[in-house]
Amino acid sequence: MFKIIPALFLLISSTFLYAESNVSTEQEIQIFDDTHRVISEYVYDISNSVDNLLSGEFFKEKNEARKNVNYKDEDSLDAFFQTDKFKSETSQTYLRMRIESNNQSKTSDKNKIKLRAHLPLSKTKHVLKLFLKSKKDNNTTKNDSNTKNAKTIEFNSKYSIGASSFKPYLKARYFIAYELGNNWSFEPAQTFRYSYNDKFEETTDFYLDKKLSKVQLLRFQVSRHTKQHHSGMDYNFATQMFWKLPKKSAFSVSQNFWGNTKYKYDLNKPTYGGISDYATSFNFRQNVWKKWFFYEISPGVNFHRMYNYKPNYNARFFLDIYFGRTYIR
C-alpha cells in the first residue's frame, strides 16, 4: 500500500510540473494514463494474489493474465454514486483517493484526503460455497421427492477485505433480491464487519426500490447497526431519489432520519432513544475526465439534537480518483 503513495503524489502533481515545461499536452495526458495504469495493475495484482492465497489457488494461478471483466452493475446509479450498497456488493477491485472539503455552519470546516481500498474475495467465496454445498449434500436424506418440488431461496453472498484510511477490515455481506412486479424490488441484507480499530460491527439493511424510468430510481431504506463497545443500536430511515443526467452526470435528493436507542451526548442528561438527527441533502456528481476521475457537490441541512435541532447548513465537495477495476460508465 505504501508503494502506491509516491505514485499517487506523482499523478496529482505531474500536471503542474509539466505545465511549466515544453512537453506537449498529449505527452502530459500520456504520463497520467501510464501512471494510472501502473497503479491500477498493482492494485489488481495485490487483490488477485490475496484471493488466490485464501482460496488455495495461489500457485495454480500465479501467472494468470489480467482479464477485462464486464460488471453487470457498472451502469447502475448505485455504482455511479458509490453508495454503501454498491460498495458492499460489488465484485470490482479498486483503490479510491478522495479529496474532501466539508463546510458546516455549526462546526469548523474540515478538509481531508482519504484512501479506501476494496479487494473482493470472489474465488474464496466460490470455495466456501462448494464446501457448504458438500456439507449439505452429505446431510441430505433419502426423501428427495419433496425436496425437488419445494421452492428454495438462494441467498447471495459477498466477501471482501479492504482498508479505510489505512485501517484494514474484513467484511461479509449476505443478501437476496426479490422482484415484486411493476418495477418494484425488495432487498434485505446483513453485513458483518471486523476491523482492528472498531472491532466487530453488524448492519441490517432493507431496500425497497421503484424504477420509475430508465433514468429515475426511487428508494426507501431502513437500517439498523450495532458496534462492539458502543451502547445502544443505531437506526436510520431514508428516502432517496436518483436521476441520470446527460454528460456523464447524475443527481440525487436524500432525506434521512437517524437515531440511537441509547443516544447520549451530555453526561448530565439521560439517554435518548428517539430521532436525534434529521438531514436533507442534494448531490450532483459528474465524471469529468477519462473513466476514473469524478467530482461531487453536496449541499444540505441537518437538525441535530446536539444543537437543539437548530439548522446546521453544510456544503461538501469531493474529488475522487479510482484505480484498479473500477466503475466505467
Model-derived regions: residue spans:
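Classical Sec-dependent N-terminal signal peptides that target proteins to the secretory pathway
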Residues: M1-E20
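Transmembrane beta-barrel domains of bacterial outer-membrane proteins
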Residues: E20-R329
